[in-house]
Regions:
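Catalytic core of pol beta-like nucleotidyltransferases
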Residues: 2-107, 116-195
Length: 195
């Protein structure tokens, strides 16, 4: 039997995310359970919280406003992917994850892969040359080994760009960490969604 308190935690966590009072979904879940005094209850999954965040966003913005928000996020992705495709000779950018589906709830982070032989430093310099702020450099330990990443923001939207050497990471629709299927959108597909 499902415990309705689990859903109460999910809803409260969504409210915390929507009001920017939590840095991550995990933090929001823990804070919500604590605030409600539910210490012996199964915690909700991240997906359940995201559904509540999406519902709150649609309630606040209306369906047209939510659709505009999705388009705004896609435009940020399209701009950075266009810069990469046109300015880095062999680059093939790919939007991955929930944003590729148009799900922009819970403090969206755009996950962009760029398949290229160019160094992460060259990719970063290209972005700076095109007016982006200096990105932060990171490394991720994935199923394919250690991959270089850039973290930056555009119009208040966080972008996490992962450089994928084509000879190491095949172009695929799988999560780099879990190997599970993940939604993707090429630049051409993204442009069709925006048309």
């Amino acid at each position: 039997m499902k415990d309705s308190r689990t859903d109460e935690i999910a809803f409260e966590a969504a409210r915390l995310m929507e009001s920017n009072r939590a840095e991550s979904i995990g933090e929001a879940i823990r804070a919500a359970a604590s605030a409600l005094g539910y210490h012996d209850v199964d915690l909700p999954g991240h997906g359940r919280v995201r559904k509540h965040v999406q519902g709150l966003a649609m309630q606040a913005l209306g369906s047209e406003g939510y659709a505009r928000s999705v388009s705004d996020v896609w435009r940020v992705a399209e701009r950075i992917m266009t810069v990469l495709a046109e300015a880095v000779p062999d680059a093939e950018p790919l939007l991955v994850g929930r944003a590729a589906q148009g799900l922009i709830d819970g403090g969206v982070t755009l996950h962009v892969r760029v398949y290229t032989e160019a160094s992460i430093g060259d990719v970063a310099q290209t972005l700076v040359d095109f007016g982006y702020e200096e990105p932060g450099f990171e490394t991720a330990a994935t199923r394919f080994g250690r991959l270089d990443r850039l973290r930056l923001a555009d119009e208040g939207i966080e972008v996490l760009l992962t450089r994928c050497p084509p000879n190491v990471v095949g172009r695929s629709s799988v999560d780099l960490f879990s190997g599970k299927p993940v939604s993707t959108a090429t630049l051409a597909e993204l442009r069709r969604k925006l048309a």
